[in-house]
Amino acid sequence: MSLLLAKLPEAYAPFDPIVDVLPIIPVLFLLLAFVWQASVSFR
C-alpha cells in the first residue's frame, strides 16, 4: 500500500485531510453514543 502511495503522491494528495480525520471518527462516534445514551436515559 505504501508503495502505491509512493508512486501516486499527486493522486493521493487530495485525500490527506481525510487520512488526518480518520483517527478522530471513532472518538466522535463514542461521544455521539454517549450523548444519545444520556438523552435517552434522561427522558
Swiss-Prot record:
Example of a GO biological process term: photosynthesis
Keywords, comma-separated and alphabetical: Chloroplast, Membrane, Photosynthesis, Photosystem II, Plastid, Reaction center, Thylakoid, Transmembrane, Transmembrane helix
TM annotation in the entry: 18-38
Pfam families noted in UniProt: PsbK
Coiled-coil spans in chain: none
Propiece residues: 1-6
GO annotations of cellular component type: chloroplast thylakoid membrane; photosystem II reaction center
Entry's localization field: Plastid, Chloroplast thylakoid membrane
Topology term for the membrane: Single-pass membrane protein
SUPFAM superfamilies listed in its UniProt record: Photosystem II reaction center protein K, PsbK (SSF161037)
InterPro entries (alphabetical): PSII_PsbK, PSII_PsbK_sf
Summary of the function given for this chain in its UniProt record: One of the components of the core complex of photosystem II (PSII). PSII is a light-driven water:plastoquinone oxidoreductase that uses light energy to abstract electrons from H(2)O, generating O(2) and a proton gradient subsequently used for ATP formation. It consists of a core antenna complex that captures photons, and an electron transfer chain that converts photonic excitation into a charge separation.
Subunit structure: PSII is composed of 1 copy each of membrane proteins PsbA, PsbB, PsbC, PsbD, PsbE, PsbF, PsbH, PsbI, PsbJ, PsbK, PsbL, PsbM, PsbT, PsbX, PsbY, PsbZ, Psb30/Ycf12, at least 3 peripheral proteins of the oxygen-evolving complex and a large number of cofactors. It forms dimeric complexes.
Family: Belongs to the PsbK family.
This protein's name: Photosystem II reaction center protein K
